[in-house]
Regions:
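Active-site acidic/histidine proton-transfer and metal-coordination neighborhood
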Residues: 72-164
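Short loop/turn segments at strand-loop or loop-helix junctions that form parts
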Residues: 63-67, 103-107, 198-200
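Acidic-and-aromatic substrate-binding clefts and catalytic sites of carbohydrate-active enzymes
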Residues: 13-21, 34-48, 70-73, 109-113, ...
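Histidine-acidic metal/acid-base catalytic patches
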Residues: 1-8, 18-23, 88, 99, ...
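Alpha-helix-loop-beta-strand connector modules within alpha/beta enzyme cores
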Residues: 50-67, 121-135, 217-224, 229
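Conserved, mostly hydrophobic/aromatic
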Residues: 30, 63, 82, 93, ...
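Hydrophobic "anchor" residues on beta-strands that sit immediately upstream
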Residues: 27, 59, 137, 164, ...
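N-terminal pre-domain/capping segments
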Residues: 1-88, 257
C-alpha cells in the first residue's frame, strides 16, 4: 500500500547546504540548523542571515543547540548553561516566526541513570515551558536513549500540549539503541510531533540517504502516518537529493515540474 503524499508534511534539514533552495524547488518545508551550534546565538549577524535563508518557506522547524547542553546534568551550573542557551534559541525562533522547535533529550548512557534522566528532565522542561508561548511546539529528540520509555515518561509526566517528542529513526537504529526503530513508534505516538528520517546499517550514525541502509523506511513512514497522523518529517542528509528522488519513486512526494 503506497504512503499518502508527504508534500505538506516533509521538511529538509539545513545540514544540506542546499536545503533552502531544495525546499523551494520541491515545495517542501525546512528545518533550520542555523543555531544548532550554540555560539552562533551570540552572533548578531546570524539572525538576519537566517531570516534571509528561510524567506518564502512557509513550513519551518527550528533545531535547537545541543553540544554540551544537558538538561539532566548533575552539576546545576551545567544545567544553567543549557537553560540559558535554550532560552536564547527560543528567542531566536520567535524572532524568525518559527513556532516549532526540536531539542535533544540529552541522555548519555553510563553517565546518567534513566530514573535521574527522567526526574531532572521533567523539572528542567517544566521550568523552560514557563517562557514558551501557548502556540509553540517543542519536540524532544532521541539520540542515545536505548528505548523510547524515558522520553515517553518525560512527556507523560509533564503533560503539556506544548511539549511532544521527535523520533529520530536513524538514532533508533544505532549501536546505542536496544529497540528496533519500528518499536519506537507506537509508544511515542501520543506525543509524536516530528520524525527525523535518515538511514544506516545498524551501527554508526551515518545519516545516509533513505534508500541506503537496513531501516525499513517505507514501513516506518506508513506506520507513523497511521499512528501519529499529525506528525511531520525531516530528511536529515548532507545531500538530501537522493532521498527526495527515493521518496518520489515511492509516490510519497511529487517531483518538481
Amino acid at each position: 500500500m503506497a504512503s499518502p503524499l508527504l508534500q505538506g508534511k516533509l521538511h529538509i534539514s539545513g545540514m544540506d547546504s542546499c536545503a533552502p533552495a531544495l525546499a523551494r524547488q520541491w515545495q517542501l518545508g525546512l528545518e533550520t540548523i542555523a543555531f544548532s551550534y550554540a555560539p552562533l546565538l551570540d552572533d548578531p549577524a546570524a539572525l538576519p542571515r537566517t531570516r534571509e535563508e528561510i524567506h518564502g518557506i512557509s513550513s519551518l522547524w527550528f533545531h535547537g543547540p545541543f553540544a554540551e547542553l544537558i538538561p539532566c546534568a548533575i552539576d546545576p551550573l551545567a544545567r544553567d548553561v543549557a537553560m540559558r542557551r535554550f532560552r536564547q534559541a527560543l528567542d531566536a525562533a520567535q524572532a524568525l516566526s518559527i513556532r516549532r522547535m526540536v531539542f535533544h533529550g540529552g541522555f548519555i548512557p553510563h553517565v546518567y541513570f534513566p530514573e535521574w534522566y527522567v526526574e531532572q528532565s521533567v523539572w528542567f522542561w517544566r521550568e523552560f515551558l514557563r517562557d514558551v508561548p501557548a502556540d509553540m511546539t517543542l519536540a524532544l529528540e532521541n539520540v542515545m536513549e536505548p528505548s523510547p520509555e524515558t522520553l515517553v515518561s518525560i512527556a507523560a509526566q509533564i503533560d503539556d500540549p506544548r511539549l511532544g517528542l521527535c523520533l529520530d529513526v536513524g538514532h533508533a537504529n544505532t549501536c546505542v539503541s536496544e529497540t528496533p526503530p519500528m518499536d519506537w513508534i507506537v509508544p511515542m505516538a501520543p506525543w509524536l510531533r516530528h520524525v527525523h528520517l535518515h538511514n544506516n546499517q545498524g551501527d554508526t550514525d551515518l545519516h545516509a540517504p533513505l534508500g541506503e541502509g537496513n531501516i525499513p523506511m517505507r514501513q516506518i513512514i506508513d506506520t507513523v502516518l497511521h499512528a501519529a497522523p499529525e506528525a511531520t518529517f525531516t530528511i536529515e542528509n548532507q545531500n538530501a537529493l537522493p532521498s527526495l528522488h527515493w521518496l518520489a519513486a515511492q509516490g510519497s512526494i511529487e517531483e518538481p515540474t
